Design a protein with these regions (language model features):
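Positively charged, small/polar-rich N-terminal and surface patches that mediate targeting and assembly
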Residues: 1-121
Length: 121
């Protein structure tokens, strides 16, 4: 078993998984690092528009989960964008409209998972 006390860092027992718009990812990562939270960033895509998103992982003690979520809440905001109808996946190939559709974009989704085992090498 690895001795975690030698690092001086509290042992993480929660994995905070944050899925955010790539528009907000850089600022979120900077704020988390400034708060001394460990960060791993992975590019991803998702949502019904298949736009770029980023998944950020941070292993923290349970006592710090609310602080991490507060940073996500401060940085990641939903926005409204006008999108051409042709780009919507649920519209047929022959669809055409001169008027774009307003769609909610961005924001974030947070999952908090228990860590059963943690090892640092």
């Amino acid at each position: 078993m690895v001795d975690h006390t030698s690092t001086g860092q509290p042992r993480p027992d929660r994995l905070v998984m944050m899925i955010v718009s790539d528009t907000d990812a850089e600022e979120l990562q900077s704020r988390l690092v400034a708060g001394h939270y460990p960060v791993t960033k992975v590019g991803s895509t998702g949502g019904f528009l298949r736009r770029g998103s980023v998944t950020i992982f941070s292993g923290v003690p349970q006592s710090q989960v609310d602080a991490v979520i507060a940073i996500v809440d401060e940085v990641c905001h939903a926005r409204r964008e006008l999108v051409p109808v042709q780009t919507l996946p649920f519209i047929g190939d022959g669809a055409f409209s001169a008027e774009p559709v307003e769609v909610r974009m961005g924001g974030g989704v947070v999952f908090v998972l228990p860590i059963e085992r943690y090892e640092r090498f």
